[in-house]
Amino acid sequence: MVAAQDPPNAPHIPVLLEPILTRCAPITGTWLDGTFGAGGYARGLLEAGADRVIGVDQDPLALEMAADWAGDYGDRLRLVAGNFEALDAHAGGPLDGVVLDLGVSSMQLDRAERGFSFLRDGPLDMRMAQHGRSAADLVAEEDADMLADILFHLGEERAARRIARAIVAARAVAPITRTSQLAEIVASCLPRPKPGQSHAATRSFQALRIAVNDELGALVRGLEAAEGALEPGGWLAVVTFHSIEDRIVKRFFTQASGGAGRANRYAPETEDTPARFRLEPRKAIAPTEAEVAANPRARSARLRIGRRTAAPAMPADRAALGLPHLYTLTETP
């Protein structure tokens, strides 16, 4: 399931913050917010009693905007420029809790120049850290087969091959450099959405953003880093917004809680290992109707929480996590 993008000027409200604070109570010690964004989770943790919060974000703009209020918390809040995939290094010591919100923040969507949104015309960029290959580069350089694989595996777009062929045909006429260009190409390949349905370009934009930022590779590395950094009794709370991410997080926690993970029913079973996490609760937490009414962005969100045991950390069985067989998502950097 893919959530529609926020309407223009929608405020960024931390999703499922209350169940995180309630389930992980009492909030004490040192926490790391690996997707700092507008700082909603970090502030919530500090107000709930965390002694210290380390806010990590790879987007320079997020940290720049936080400068206006971060000083109010003194040395209780430390901001770090970087990706949460290396959160153990950013932490500089053991942690009592880690929070990851895997959605794109509203302040990124609201800025047309960042190129994340099909609702606003801007350069086709989509880079969180603002370096490396952009979405425009990817659209210009990859062949139709690779583009189709990206759209299908990372966006679950059923019309992936039709859209990929349309992109290749369009770029032969003129470079695709604007979000509006790409949105129009995608929309031309699909039926007009019914009222209440997501924009036709939602899945394609999601897929390109994930590919540009290697989001699934970073997610797996971040989950492993969190496992290694957390103290026994520490909490890992992960908020996802689409089924691909949620499947990976679910299977990671299944493995780490002592269950044998399998990539599919035909794969050989693996032996159970000592539980490194206890799931609290065992199933994902969905937002309440009241939260969705107050914050439509929360509609597709799912929260999974695990509590670290004293068992030694170990790498995840990546073949069993459900990672798409695409790019280098299963590779260790």
Curated annotation (Swiss-Prot):
Keyword 4Fe-4S tagged: no
Residues bound to S-adenosyl-L-methionine: G39, G40, Y41, D57, F84, D101, Q108
GO CC annotation, single: cytoplasm
Enzyme class, first EC level, given as a word: transferase
A matching Pfam family: Methyltransf_5
EC number: 2.1.1.199
Compartment(s): Cytoplasm
GO term, biological process aspect, one: rRNA base methylation
Assigned keywords, A-Z: Cytoplasm, Methyltransferase, rRNA processing, S-adenosyl-L-methionine, Transferase
Gene3D superfamilies: Putative methyltransferase TM0872, insert domain, Vaccinia Virus protein VP39
Catalytic activity as recorded in UniProt: cytidine(1402) in 16S rRNA + S-adenosyl-L-methionine = N(4)-methylcytidine(1402) in 16S rRNA + S-adenosyl-L-homocysteine + H(+)
InterPro entries xref list: RsmH, SAM-dep_MeTrfase_MraW_recog, SAM-dependent_MTases_sf
Disulfide bridge map: none
Single GO MF descriptor: rRNA (cytosine-N4-)-methyltransferase activity
UniProt main location, coarse: cytoplasm
SUPFAM superfamilies, alphabetized: Putative methyltransferase TM0872, insert domain, S-adenosyl-L-methionine-dependent methyltransferases
UniProt function note: Specifically methylates the N4 position of cytidine in position 1402 (C1402) of 16S rRNA.
Family: Belongs to the methyltransferase superfamily. RsmH family.
HAMAP family: 16SrRNA_methyltr_H
Protein name: Ribosomal RNA small subunit methyltransferase H
Natural source organism: Dinoroseobacter shibae (strain DSM 16493 / NCIMB 14021 / DFL 12)
Underlying gene: rsmH
